[in-house]
From Swiss-Prot:
This is Serine/threonine-protein kinase TAO1. Changing T643A: Abolishes phosphorylation by ATM. It is an enzyme of class 2 (transferase). One of its GO terms (biological process) is mitotic G2 DNA damage checkpoint signaling. The gene is TAOK1. Serine/threonine-protein kinase activity is inhibited by SPRED1. Belongs to the protein kinase superfamily. STE Ser/Thr protein kinase family. STE20 subfamily. It comes from Homo sapiens (Human). Changing K57A: Abolishes kinase activity, ability to activate the MAPK8/JNK cascade and cleavage by caspase-3 (CASP3). Highly expressed in the testis, and to a lower extent also expressed in brain, placenta, colon and skeletal muscle.
Length: 1001
């Protein structure tokens, strides 16, 4: 266990700040125990620094459950530090000494339950309204700060001497709302608190229910169901209707207020703020109603304490004088009985005081006691002196000096008793007297009873504490399991999100890599096409240069041949003069040279036109090839995106199935745990009830045994009483006999005296014999009657107890059956809700997948459309430029065979497919591979004078770009292979409208 969690550890700075470092034994003196509970004791004390009266609650955190006790102390100290309200107890500090926390608070006179204990009768409605109004103001403050008291009852509603109402005992309070802990005192618990673990959370309205029960307690001296076993009361509250006021003497406003507080459904129950506007608490009432009530109570307490003092003084006096006469003692006791009955109604004790979850004195047992009625005054006085009541924490509150001054100055009796004293002197005396006087509305017998009660009834108190501890442990186990499963679910969801994110990142990286690859392919293709164009130009230029050289050589040979022919012709004609021959020969040479020059110029012009035309054709062919490559790359990219999206959707569906399986498994685990905890709880409840039944039967048997043991003494006293009556009768008869004998002796002659005496003697003997017979008969009849009465009474008590215990057991069974049914209904509801959530999530996922697929399809169509439109614009721009340069589209579309009839070293095919082979296109697939430039055409080269002959060997790829170009269709005339290929193309609009897109093959 970490040191910071160890009981009493102050290593945590936040915890250390909660406690003062001083030694409390040096700061507080004159400690007097005024209360006791399972947590420890409550003391009246005086602060030596300010001479201020305070109350100290000592709470030990050693022994069993020390860590739990320490946590309860820390929670209560934190709670007290947070609250500051006139209707809440004032916190002064907390000290630690020898594994005991000294919780110092203001001192008050007592609690509302003390009023009931002292007066032994219900409070008046106006007094209940005043107390309820003050308690409501304190509750409204707590609820506005999302805090819940969770232990509202008369014992925890305190009163100061000026008549101020204060809430106390925050050991059960919750600093968060809503909550779901099983805490409080059973008879005052709201149904949703009892069913907290089974049905969920609750809020501050549980205090409103407890306040309604407290109103009934103040009006009837005890809460509903108080004569019932505490465990049975819990079952009764959870499944039966709300209690109501029994008497008809209360006003309709009070009844409506109580009924509003005790609405079974929390949603129908008003809040504390709403109840502050109820006419019951807003009705006009005397301002001094609580002050007068407190003063009457103090007077009654003083009278009761004086009674106890006189009894003790009498006992001491008797002991000092060896005891007075019995008759005088009995007369004085009877007088004391009369005094006790005039000042108070007979108290009823309780063997059913149940401890609450609170660590305060008031919540260790209920503030009202209950025992069977006792008729004789002696038993009443014994109960008043020795029976056990519950002392609340109300006597642990300090009375402020200014409040004491106000009380003393505001008391008309104080002013009337000393009318001539100056105000300042009176105020000073009042202040000094209240500082020195131990003011309280609790009798000494109440304190003694509480201390004795804490020592007794430990078995019942421990049973309830164990039950509450079990409920807390079950709730903690369930919360631990829920947190564990929630962490597992979060971890699983995080892992799935991480897997999905990893896949998306991988897909993004792959797509980025593919795009870069495509960019590199396009750049490479551009370079290759540029090089091919240069090589193509160089090839044609080389061919043309070779042709030109051949042409020039041919001209030279022709020139020489023609020259020789001309010379021969001149030589044959000898008649022509030489000069004339020379001139004619020169002229012929010039003509030949001029003709050859013209032919050379014509050849150069045709070569230049051919070069420009072929280069333009080549560029158009390269443009179409680049378009085909772009289409292939876009198709590959879109197919890749489609594949990635399909894989992502498949993963989302798998993750949905995985989450669904985990959610159902978690729900099943929680429901199994809840069923097991309910089973253990019901088993514990049944065990506790059976133990309670055995204990009640054992107590009844013990009582009957004591009665049987006491019967001989009772019979002896009855026999002595009958014997005394017989003796008195004998004495009377003897006196009557003597009187009759004297009378007869006086009236009869002396001679008859002997006969008269004999007759009288016989008569006396006969009557005495009759008396003796009557005496024996009376004794026998008394013995038989007393034995029969005892047997009948004990048998009746046994039957009543058996019926009561059987009813409580049936009530427990009904409660447990209801809990099981509610648990099953809750499990079915949770299962249905989970199925609905899963179905909704699946539907949303499928809708998302459909939307993403539609978006991807739209993106695909848009990409294709934009690509085709851009390519069409490029073709159109190229053709427009060609027309401007004087090239016909028909001529550009029909490629010259001379472009492919001359191979050159390193020449490659013009159609490049980066994917490694001819792939499918948006149009009709081509049949056969493209033809390389280096392949010779059929029929050999044609003369340069006929450059525009038919092209038998045009590669089929050359028409591919034209076929896929919608603009080329409008520019190309019909006929020929190219026209056949282009006739199969469609426009961009028709391709998109017909759903033409890349295939996935």
């Amino acid at each position: 266990m970490p040191s910071t969690n160890r009981a009493g550890s102050l290593k945590d700075p936040e915890i250390a700040e909660l406690f003062f470092k001083e030694d409390p034994e040096k700061l507080f003196t004159d400690l007097r125990e005024i209360g006791h509970g399972s947590f420890g004791a409550v003391y009246f004390a005086r602060d030596v620094r300010t001479n201020e009266v305070v109350a100290i609650k000592k709470m030990s955190y050693s022994g069993k459950q020390s860590t739990e006790k320490w946590q309860d102390i820390i929670k209560e100290v934190k709670f007290l530090q947070r609250i500051k309200h006139p209707n809440s107890i004032e916190y002064k500090g907390c000290y630690l000494r020898e594994h005991t926390a000294w919780l110092v608070m203001e001192y008050c006179l007592g609690s509302a339950s003390d009023l009931l204990e002292v007066h032994k009768k219900p409070l008046q409605e106006v007094e209940i309204a005043a107390i309820t109004h003050g308690a409501l103001q304190g509750l409204a403050y707590l609820h506005s700060h999302t805090m819940i008291h969770r232990d509202i009852k008369a014992g925890n509603i305190l009163l100061t001497e000026p008549g101020q109402v204060k809430l106390a005992d925050f050991g059960s309070a919750s600093m968060a709302s809503p909550a779901n802990s099983f805490v409080g005192t059973p008879y005052w618990m709201a149904p949703e608190v009892i069913l907290a673990m089974d049905e969920g959370q609750y809020d501050g309205k549980v205090d409103v229910w407890s306040l309604g029960i407290t109103c009934i307690e103040l009006a009837e001296r005890k809460p509903p169901l108080f004569n019932m076993n505490a465990m049975s009361a819990l079952y009764h509250i959870a499944q039966n209707e709300s209690p109501t006021l029994q008497s008809n003497e209360w006003s309709d406003y009070f009844r409506n207020f109580v009924d509003s507080c005790l609405q079974k459904i929390p949603q129908d129950r008003p809040t504390s703020e709403e109840l502050l506007k109820h006419i019951f608490v807003l009705r006009e009432r005397p301002e001094t109603v609580l002050i007068d009530l407190i003063q009457r109570t103090k007077d009654a307490v003083r009278e009761l304490d004086n009674l106890q003092y006189r009894k003790m003084k009498k006992l001491l006096f008797q002991e000092a004088h060896n005891g007075p006469a019995v008759e005088a003692q009995e007369e004085e006791e009877e007088q004391d009985h009369g005094v006790g009955r005039t000042g108070t109604v007979n108290s009823v004790g309780s063997n059913q005081s149940i401890p609450s979850m609170s660590i305060s004195a008031s919540s260790q047992s209920s503030s009202v006691n209950s025992l069977p009625d006792v008729s004789d005054d002696k038993s009443e006085l014994d109960m008043m002196e020795g029976d056990h009541t519950v002392m609340s924490n109300s006597s642990v509150i300090h009375l402020k000096p200014e409040e004491e001054n106000y009380r003393e100055e505001g008391d008309p009796r104080t002013r009337a008793s000393d009318p001539q004293s100056p105000p300042q002197v009176s105020r000073h005396k009042s202040h000094y007297r209240n500082r020195e006087h131990f003011a309280t509305i609790r009798t000494a017998s109440l304190v003694t009873r509480q201390m004795q009660e804490h020592e007794q009834d430990s078995e019942l108190r421990e049973q309830m504490s164990g039950y509450k501890r079990m409920r807390r442990q079950h709730q903690k186990q369930l919360m631990t399991l829920e947190n564990k499963l929630k962490a597992e679910m979060d971890e699983h969801r995080l892992r799935l999100d991480k897997d999905l994110e990893t896949q998306r990142n991988n897909f993004a990286a792959e797509m980025e890599k593919l795009i870069k690859k495509h960019q590199a392919a396009m750049e490479k293709e551009a370079k290759v096409m540029s090089n091919e164009e240069k090589k193509f130009q160089q090839h044609i230029q080389a061919q043309q240069k070779k042709e030109l050289n051949s042409f020039l050589e041919s001209q030279k040979r022709e020139y020489k041949l023609r020259k020789e022919q001309l010379k021969e012709e001149l030589n044959e004609n000898q008649s022509t003069p030489k000069k004339e021959k020379q001139e004619w020969l020169s002229k012929q040479k010039e003509n030949i040279q001029h003709f050859q020059a013209e032919e050379e110029a014509n050849l150069l012009r045709r070569q230049r036109q051919y070069l420009e035309l072929e280069c333009r054709r080549f560029k158009r062919r390269m443009l179409l090839g680049r378009h085909n490559l772009e289409q292939d790359l876009v198709r590959e990219e879109l197919n890749k995106r489609q594949t990635q999206k399909d894989l992502e959707h498949a993963m989302l569906l798998r993750q949905h199935e995985s989450m669904q399986e985990l959610e159902f498994r978690h729900l099943n685990t929680i429901q199994k745990m809840r069923c097991e905890l309910i089973r253990l709880q019901h088993q514990t409840e049944l065990t506790n009830q059976l133990e309670y039944n055995k204990r009640r039967e054992r107590e009844l048997r013990r009582k009957h045994v004591m009665e049987v043991r006491q019967q001989p003494k009772s019979l002896k006293s009855k026999e002595l009483q009958i014997k005394k009556q017989f003796q008195d009768t004998c004495k009377i008869q003897t006196r009557q006999y003597k009187a009759l004998r004297n009378h007869l002796l006086e009236t009869t002659p002396k001679s008859e005296h002997k006969a008269v005496l004999k007759r009288l003697k016989e008569e006396q003997t006969r009557k005495l014999a009759i008396l003796a017979e009557q005496y024996d008969h009376s004794i026998n009849e008394m013995l038989s009657t007393q034995a029969l009465r005892l047997d009948e009474a004990q048998e009746a008590e046994c039957q009543v107890l058996k019926m009561q215990l059987q009813q409580e057991l049936e009530l427990l069974n009904a409660y447990q059956s209801k809990i099981k049914m509610q648990a099953e209904a809750q499990h079915d509801r949770e299962l249905r809700e989970l199925e609905q959530r899963v179905s909704l999530r699946r539907a949303l996922l499928e809708q998302k997948i459909e939307e993403e697929m539609l978006a991807l399809q739209n993106e695909r169509t848009e990409r294709i459309r934009s690509l085709l439109e851009r390519q069409a614009r490029e073709i159109e721009a190229f053709d427009s430029e060609s027309m401007r340069l004087g090239f016909s589209n028909m001529v550009l579309s029909n490629l010259s065979p001379e472009a492919f009839s001359h191979s050159y070293p390193g020449a490659s095919g013009w159609s490049h497919n980066p994917t490694g082979g001819p792939g499918p296109h948006w149009g009709h697939p081509m049949g056969g591979p493209p033809q390389a430039w280096g392949h010779p055409m059929q029929g050999g080269p044609q003369p340069w004078g006929h450059p525009s002959g038919p092209m038998q060997g045009v590669p089929r790829g050359s028409s591919m770009g034209v076929r896929n170009s919608p603009q080329a269709l409008r520019r190309t005339a019909s006929g020929g292979r190219t026209e056949q290929g282009m006739s199969r193309s469609t426009s961009v609009t028709s391709q998109i409208s017909n759903g033409s897109h890349m295939s996935y093959t």
